[in-house]
Amino acid sequence: MDFSSCNNHYFYDVDMKEDFYRCIAPSEDIWKKFELVPGFPLSSGGCPGGGGTDWAAEMMDLGWESPVKLTGLSSVVLLRDCMWSGFSTRERLEKVIHERLSTGSPRVTNTQKPVADNETSEPGVDSIEQNATPLVVPTPIPEKVPNSSGSESTSDSEEDEIDVVTVEKRKSYGGRQPVTITVRADPTATKLFHISIHQQQHNYAARLPPEPNTMSPQHNFHSTVKEEPGEVTSPPELQPCSPQMPDSPLASGSSDSEDLAKRKNHNYLERKRRNDLRSRFLALREEVPSLSRSTKTPKVVVLSKATEFLKGLVIQEQQLTAEKLKLWSRHQQLLRRISQLKGR
């Protein structure tokens, strides 16, 4: 196989020598180089067993207008070459392909099924894709990914590596089950807890919790009497009743006398206010010329006539002040005239 033609078609611009997909160390963040480039889908048909150059020729005939359509073998090889810096030489790639084609044991085919269930292709292609699946598809446990990637260059047999990856996946699936059970159980418990708090805080129609029964003062008094029997000589019930019997008529008589005094004072003040108001209206009626001779006049009529008379007085006052100013000016003119006559 010759992958140089594929590399020329994969890069965007070879003339400008823009090395977007240079090989980097595994410790660096390689995903930054592939953020804007979509991944290549793995075809289900696979590539033919012996024609390694047919897929490269077909890929070159597509042109830049259509996206690159790669088979399962080519996509896996390119992804491993570009992403993980593996299979950088042609000899190592051919060696691996020949090993997979020659050693097609049933153990390898059995381990391929849990990893790639949906892919159906030839045995040689399946072996190469199975070799690349632990590198392209990350396992659920992140600690196991560097182990599978580092085992490519150090391990002697690739079949053991595939078995380890499948066992790790099964273990990870088995370990996820209790986690999902606990996660499903937590929200229900929290919801019930919040509902109970909400009902306790906002259920205003509910009855209050029963309060502790407070002891009556009579019961407390009996308890104190029982504790100190030597100090009490007479029954306590008769002491407050004996002075209240003779004092009850005196208290009622004093309250009645206070009410009578308040009523008398109120009546006196009310009569005084009415007499003062009547005398004021009579004086106002005497001041109004049109009502001075009438003996019985309603208060409303007295007020209306008084306001009219007051407005008339205001107008007369304004007229008199204007006339006064005119007379004062005339007086000043006469004084000047007298002074002029004396000067001659």
From Swiss-Prot:
GO biological process terms on file: regulation of transcription by RNA polymerase II
Question: How is this protein named in the record?
Answer: Protein L-Myc-1-B
Segments for region (Disordered)? 104-162, 208-271
For the bHLH domain, which residue ranges apply? 261-313
User: Which molecular function GO terms apply here?
Assistant: DNA-binding transcription factor activity, RNA polymerase II-specific; protein dimerization activity; RNA polymerase II cis-regulatory region sequence-specific DNA binding
Give the quaternary structure: Efficient DNA binding requires dimerization with another bHLH protein. Binds DNA as a heterodimer with MAX.
Keywords attached to this Swiss-Prot or TrEMBL record, sorted alphabetically, are: DNA-binding, Nucleus, Phosphoprotein
**Which SUPFAM superfamilies is this protein grouped with?**
HLH, helix-loop-helix DNA-binding domain (SSF47459)
Enumerate the PANTHER family for this protein.
Answer: MYC PROTO-ONCOGENE
Q: Which GO terms describe its cellular component?
A: nucleus
Where are the residues of the annotated region Leucine-zipper?
313-341
According to the UniProt entry, which residue ranges have a biased composition of type Basic and acidic residues? 259-270
Keyword Phosphoprotein appears in the UniProt entry: yes
Coiled coil regions, renumbered to chain:
none
Q: In which tissues is it expressed?
A: High levels in oocytes, modest levels in kidney and low levels in spleen.
Task: Give start-end positions of Polar residues composition bias.
Answer: 104-113, 213-223
**Superkingdom assignment:** Eukaryota
A Pfam family that this protein carries is HLH
- Give the location in the cell: Nucleus
What's the main place this protein lives?
Answer: nucleus
Q: Which InterPro entries match?
A: bHLH_dom (IPR011598), HLH_DNA-bd_sf (IPR036638), Myc_transcription_factors (IPR050433), Tscrpt_reg_Myc (IPR002418), Tscrpt_reg_Myc_N (IPR012682)
Tell me which Gene3D superfamilies the record gives: Helix-loop-helix DNA-binding domain (4.10.280.10)
